[in-house]
Regions:
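Short beta-strand element of the alpha/beta-hydrolase
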Residues: 115-122
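Flexible "cap/lid" subdomain of the alpha/beta-hydrolase fold that forms the substrate-access gate
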Residues: 64-94, 102-105, 110, 117, ...
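The serine-hydrolase catalytic nucleophile loop
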Residues: 124-135
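Bacterial N-terminal signal peptides
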Residues: 48-59
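A short, Lys/Arg-enriched amphipathic alpha-helix followed by its capping loop at the start of a domain
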Residues: 134-144, 182
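Conserved alpha/beta-hydrolase "nucleophile elbow" surrounding the catalytic nucleophile
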Residues: 122-124, 192-193
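Catalytic histidine-centered segment of alpha/beta-hydrolase-like enzymes
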Residues: 354-367
């Protein structure tokens, strides 16, 4: 059996496997284990609203003894492959602005135009810059055509006034769909993170036959992985029912005071590049951007009622599914990753020692996982 790499744990099968592995932990020598421990009770700020993010604390074994494996073989497939960083180099991307519905949308693109296409949808408050290194490595393989755009008001895209452009997930998804049409992208694999997940599942709903495969990274369609939204009376759900203008004003103030990344204030660690944060700071200083982001955050509450429909949609799709998750995510816990197995029992689940923006922390591992996943399937 392959040994667990330092960066990744892979499970394929049913969530019940986790409990079974916990019970068998005492049978595995210490040197053959790897433990992932996740912070509990961290207080995090998300768009001006304090939310309590209680992360899942879980211990998973790197090896399973033969008795356990035999007992599980008819119900679940378990494998722990070694994940090595990609060493094929970086291919240069090209950049541009595509005009869609009168809005200039920035995009990054690379790889052979005739290769299977991977569309990457970013989270918030970042932009397509979060995929830069991953895209360079995937383009260098010569086996994928990769493209990622910035949503309106994010990154280098235009920021139309929120009184003229409705910043809702429905509207952003419509804009993304029009962007894909403008770029003549008809069939693609979808990589979705954070806000990209509710945007992406709207695209899947609208055109399920356009999807060749699905890759989800730290984004939920199950409340399992979203502790702050589980209680109907939580601060978050109250905000989504009745917008809190005081919280909005506090966020606007904090956004305006975000400091220039420097040695004096950088707390993200050596693996997290400051370029992403600098672009976010500059982009948010444009007129109307904070209002746009607050409108979209308020509309996030429209996503939870759609979770059951998206879960059923995923069950009905006959496409490969990969889930990549940074275990140190204070917003969406690992339970959200495992929940995808209920709807896609054959999904590959990769748990990384990274945070919410794992593509910035560990792009080599993620590029390797995506390249391996896409190469194992006959994608169009």
């Amino acid at each position: 059996m392959a040994k667990l790499s330092p960066s990744s744990l892979v499970l394929q099968g049913q969530p019940e496997l986790i409990a079974c592995l916990r019970r068998q932990r005492s049978n595995v020598p210490e040197r053959k284990r790897r433990e992932f421990s996740f912070p509990k009770g961290d207080m995090v700020r998300n768009i001006g609203v304090w939310i309590i993010a209680t992360a899942l604390s879980v211990t998973v074994q790197a090896q399973v003894n033969p008795t356990t494996r035999d007992a599980l073989q008819h119900a679940v497939s378990f494998h722990v492959p070694t994940v090595a960083p990609m060493r094929s180099g970086h291919a240069a991307l090209h950049f541009g602005w595509q005009t869609v519905d009168g809005i200039h949308l920035f995009y990054r693109e690379g790889g052979p135009a005739n290769a299977p296409t991977l569309v990457l949808l970013h989270g918030s408050p970042t932009s397509s810059i979060m995929y830069q290194t991953v895209m360079e490595q995937l383009a260098a393989t010569g086996k994928l055509h990769v493209i990622a755009m910035d949503y309106p008001s994010y990154g280098y895209s235009d920021a139309p006034d929120h009184r003229q452009y409705s910043y809702t997930f429905d509207h952003i998804a419509q804009t993304v769909a029009h962007f894909l049409v403008a770029r003549d992208i008809q069939q693609y694999t979808l990589y979705m993170q954070d806000y990209g997940v509710p945007i992406g599942f709207r695209l899947i709903q609208a055109a399920p036959n356009s999807i060749s495969a699905i890759i989800v990274q730290n984004g939920v369609i199950h409340l399992d992985g979203f502790p702050a939204a589980q209680d109907p009376d939580s601060m978050l759900n109250k905000y989504w029912r009745t917008r809190d203008l005081a919280s909005d004003q506090q966020f606007a103030k904090e956004a305006a005071q975000m400091p220039f990344p420097s040695s004096a204030n950088w707390t993200q660690g050596p693996n997290f590049p400051p370029d992403n944060e600098l672009l976010t700071i500059i982009s948010q200083q444009r007129p109307g951007v904070v209002d746009a982001h607050l409108d979209l955050w308020f509309d996030y509450g429209s996503n939870m009622p759609l979770y059951p429909a998206w879960q059923n949609l995923l069950k009905s799709l006959n496409v490969p599914v990969e889930v990549i998750w940074g275990s140190r995510d204070n917003y969406f816990t690992v339970a959200g990753a495992l929940a995808y197995l209920r709807d896609a029992p054959k999904a590959e689940i990769h748990i990384l020692d990274a945070g919410h923006f794992a593509t910035l922390e560990d792009p080599d591992a993620i590029a390797a996982l995506v390249a391996g996943f896409t190469s194992r399937h006959d994608l169009r």
